[in-house]
């Protein structure tokens, strides 16, 4: 019987990855296409990726695939060939290569079958996810940014927008993509005659969002090909001004890629200029927040004095207090409400 799941502890896997000397490349990709049997596809692809020492996070559903992974550089071309020949729909698929990468983004391969590769909350049977907006390449993005008739819409979470975004882009204030979709329609009604340009990290969210906007009567809709990652890469390669300001948040150990030198966010504890996300060191919290080096030292990597005090307790007492809590082990746990309640940050949506 083939091994279809990891059998080694996280701590052991992470230590092994950190000790690796071979460089790795962090890659993200997605594809909306029909998968008749997601579980069967998942099991077959897991064996392919495991044989190539691929780490990362992969989601499959009837609607397609969404992946963020790291691949040993010596096996990168073999990986590309095997991915492209795995299914005709994946042939020639664009791979977004990380902009800043130390090769330590992942240490285990997790591959899951889900209802959707992006949780959108859409239950309208008449919605056609393939009726997407037009792609915008890097040069066209810069032209659109100077067009007074264009409105740029950020389809990422509030904490992603906080550390970096395109010039004058509108934030759709929400904690999840499924909450953003109806809000985007509502907020943009007054701009229905404008050119709507949608973007996200790698393209997967803004592609579906563009189809949703068209479904709701918006006719002039574009989305940035390959998202922020592809835009920044192509703009640099082509010698174009990079019009994204700040840092691009990513959902792996790096938690961000520097796009421009500007730091547009602030430490959530003291207000100093800072755009470095971290998780509260208290295992009973794990709040995702922005913390400067000074506050990291002052609070021992915790988000509050309460968590700092709890972290200093004996491990047995910490475990007792964590029992039954909902907050632990949510690595990207930063709902606006929870963040504000723990750090007393005013909610701009209120």
UniProtKB/Swiss-Prot annotation:
Can you state which reaction this protein catalyses?
A: uridine(34) in tRNA + AH2 + O2 = 5-hydroxyuridine(34) in tRNA + A + H2O
Query: Taking every annotated instance into account, which residue ranges of this chain make up the domain Rhodanese?
Result: 146-240
InterPro entries according to UniProt: Rhodanese-like_dom, Rhodanese-like_dom_sf, Rhodanese_C, TrhO, TRHO_N
GO-annotated biological processes: tRNA modification
Provide the alphabetized UniProt keywords: Oxidoreductase, tRNA processing
The answer to keyword Protease applying to this record is: no
Top-level lineage group: Bacteria
SMART domains this protein is in?
Answer: RHOD (SM00450)
Composition skew (Basic and acidic residues), residue ranges? 319-328
**EC number assigned by the record:** 1.14.-.-
Q: What class of enzyme is it?
A: oxidoreductase
Show the GO MF annotations.
Answer: oxidoreductase activity, acting on paired donors, with incorporation or reduction of molecular oxygen
Q: What Pfam families does the entry give?
A: Rhodanese, Rhodanese_C, UPF0176_N
User: Where do the segments described as Disordered lie?
Assistant: 319-350
Which positions are catalytic residues? 200
**What PANTHER family does the database record attribute to this sequence?**
TRNA URIDINE(34) HYDROXYLASE, UPF0176 PROTEIN YCEA
Q: What does this protein do?
A: Catalyzes oxygen-dependent 5-hydroxyuridine (ho5U) modification at position 34 in tRNAs.
Family, according to the entry, reads as follows: Belongs to the TrhO family.
Protein name, UniProt field: tRNA uridine(34) hydroxylase
Q: Which organism is it from?
A: Salmonella choleraesuis (strain SC-B67)
**Which gene holds the coding sequence for this protein?**
trhO
